[in-house]
């Protein structure tokens, strides 16, 4: 398997790109900063990048609210595709850290539970939720 033979360079993109901790929804094309680092990453001998969470989240990236969208603090899906294309052109593979065992409070299905409570079709997605005030 290729991963066993690879040298990985890990990037926590929200920190690496200087994004604010709280997601205020303001679009910034920060992920493009990675393009400037490709020569350095290659010089280190890395042939794979491990990106910590890149999906839309409320704060630190591990509380995802949209798995189909790059965090607006980092840019657009097109920005990220450009970065991945440039990495691939230089022979660097891309691995994403997907956090799929939990979501953030901003996740659409959880928002539906907050709004519709027990009548939400997604209430069972979230284990034991107490609606009695506790």
Feature map (PLM): residue ranges:
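Acidic/aromatic-lined carbohydrate-recognition and catalytic surfaces
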Residues: 1-134
């Amino acid at each position: 398997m290729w991963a066993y033979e690879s040298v990985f360079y890990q990037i926590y993109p929200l920190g690496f790109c200087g994004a604010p901790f709280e997601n205020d929804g303001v679009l910034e094309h920060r992920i493009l900063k990675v393009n400037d680092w490709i020569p350095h990453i290659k010089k280190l001998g890395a042939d794979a990048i491990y990106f910590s969470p890149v999906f839309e989240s409320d704060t630190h990236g591990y509380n995802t609210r949209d798995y189909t969208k790059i965090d607006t603090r980092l840019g657009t899906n097109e920005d990220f595709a450009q970065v991945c294309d440039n990495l691939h052109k230089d022979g660097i593979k891309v691995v994403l850290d997907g956090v799929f065992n939990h979501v953030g409070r901003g996740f659409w299905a959880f928002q539906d539970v907050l709004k519709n409570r027990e009548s939400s079709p997604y209430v069972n997605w979230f284990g034991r939720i107490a609606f009695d005030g506790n």
